[in-house]
Amino acid sequence: MASTSQWKYDVFLSFRGEDTRNTLVDFLNYALQRRGIDTFKDDEKLEGGKIIKPELSKAIDESRFAVVILSENYASSTWCLEELAKIIDCKKEKGMTVLPIFYNVYPSDVRKLTGTFAKALDEHEKLFKEKVGRWRDSLNHVADIVGYHVKNR
């Protein structure tokens, strides 16, 4: 579907693998692809503490939409936070449509940066002080977008 326009992918999926890979993400990816929607889903286990891989940044740039699946451990991953910051940049600069899914977390936890989100950002502050402000802003921004709240417990 995306091949006829400037977009290589219709949808970029941003998620924390340990929380969602074998449940919601696989189901969502399968359902979208069955309908002819080209998705980008990174299948590698990403290590924290490194910059976002260039191919992920490029895939975000080449995607028309982003689905951000915010889960309990999403903010503990610097990779996820870097993806989110890039997605929010694309939303602001290119009009990318962003759909947040709050998976087993409340939107208010993301918006107010409480619970696991606060704990993760406090930990990141020790090593990535210069980036944490941007990550906080990105989390606040995505939490203000109307999305879906999915509770699977």
Task: Report residues per predicted region.
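Eukaryotic basic, amphipathic alpha-helical target segments in cytosolic regions
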Residues: 21, 32, 36, 60, ...
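Structured beta-strand/turn binding interfaces of compact recognition modules in eukaryotic regulators
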Residues: 14-18, 35, 40-44, 49, ...
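Amphipathic alpha-helical interaction motifs in eukaryotic regulatory proteins
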Residues: 14, 29-33, 40, 57-64, ...
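C-terminal interaction surface of TIR/SEFIR-family domains
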Residues: 1-11, 22-26, 106-153
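Amphipathic helical hotspot of TIR/SEFIR-family domains
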Residues: 58, 62, 69-119
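Intrinsically disordered, low-complexity regions enriched in proline, serine, glycine
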Residues: 23-25, 40-43, 50, 77-79, ...
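Conserved N-terminal substructure of TIR/SEFIR domains
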Residues: 1-65
